[in-house]
Amino acid sequence: MIKQRTLQQAISTTGVGLHKGNKVNLTLRPAPANTGLIFRRVDLDPVVDIPARADWVRDTQLCTCLINEENVRVSTVEHLLAALAGVGIDNAIIEVDSHEIPIMDGSSHPFVYLLQSAGIEEQSAAKKFIRIKQPVRVEDGDKWAELLPHDGFRIDFAIDFEHPAIADTGQTVSIDFSANAFIKEISRARTFGFMKDIEYLRENNLALGGSFDNAVVLDEFRILNSDGLRYDDEFVKHKMLDAIGDLYMGGHSILGHLRAYKSGHALNNQLLQALLAQQSAWEFVTFDEEQATAPIAFWSPATTTA
């Protein structure tokens, strides 16, 4: 049986919020089977729990932001969610003492390292997957994203930037996640931004925590980071990383084929909402056989609970 996963033990880290630049403390805690992923604002009294669910995504302007009915929010959740998806964590309590998750180095890799350091524990309940049965597509002008039936999880993603430094890199990438590709191929891809946009955001009291330590920064012609890129196609791979995190708001790993062109947080969420609303297009599946093989490769090792 392919089992649900949580952490073996709690683990904490400290970082900086991207938009306000404040120090943020983050703790990841184990959770019982069938809990899901819960963000907990421990800076509030009483604490407020916000589940990672597609219908709670109510702001996608600069990042993915969860907002509950009382207007309590947790922002910049997508990189952490991508790490949880890539490692295959189903259940966790995510404690944070701010309205935004720390940006760390702008990628998912620090969160992957945290999860690996905490250890992965398999639970007694079967892991649920969302299997795509029928195509679902959303469009916004020339941008589009679609989910198609597929045995496993595959992404074909394309971006289209006229910037010379981005045009010189690969703007199309295809990855089949039946191989253990997320940690090696995707997790280290950093967010990126343009100096002219960053200056505007800071004038409006945003992106105050942004720096060369947590983003790839470009001027009109070139990459300004002295250490260059981590992948030749880091720009499109970061957009893929964002999509993985955004789609994990469905609460389960997807078995299907994501194809996307110039998709961002808003379109990713629209696609997930459209999928969940069209009940004939998907189904929950589990793999209960004793020798069942996971259709998506997740990081190992893991220990088994009683």
Curated annotation (Swiss-Prot):
Its EC number is 3.5.1.108. GO terms for cellular component: membrane. The active site is at H265 (proton donor). Its cofactor is Zn(2+). Keywords: Hydrolase, Lipid A biosynthesis, Lipid biosynthesis, Lipid metabolism, Metal-binding, Zinc. InterPro entries: Ribosomal_Su5_D2-typ_SF (IPR020568), UDP-acyl_GlcNac_deAcase (IPR004463), UDP-acyl_GlcNac_deAcase_C (IPR011334), UDP-acyl_N-AcGlcN_deAcase_N (IPR015870). Zn(2+) binds at H79, H238, D242. It is an enzyme of class 3 (hydrolase). GO terms for biological process: lipid A biosynthetic process. Pfam families: LpxC (PF03331). One of its GO terms (molecular function) is UDP-3-O-acyl-N-acetylglucosamine deacetylase activity. Pathway: Glycolipid biosynthesis; lipid IV(A) biosynthesis; lipid IV(A) from (3R)-3-hydroxytetradecanoyl-[acyl-carrier-protein] and UDP-N-acetyl-alpha-D-glucosamine: step 2/6. It catalyses: a UDP-3-O-[(3R)-3-hydroxyacyl]-N-acetyl-alpha-D-glucosamine + H2O = a UDP-3-O-[(3R)-3-hydroxyacyl]-alpha-D-glucosamine + acetate. Gene3D superfamilies: lpxc deacetylase, domain 1, lpxc deacetylase, domain 2. Belongs to the LpxC family. Catalyzes the hydrolysis of UDP-3-O-myristoyl-N-acetylglucosamine to form UDP-3-O-myristoylglucosamine and acetate, the committed step in lipid A biosynthesis. This is UDP-3-O-acyl-N-acetylglucosamine deacetylase. It comes from Idiomarina loihiensis (strain ATCC BAA-735 / DSM 15497 / L2-TR). The gene is lpxC.
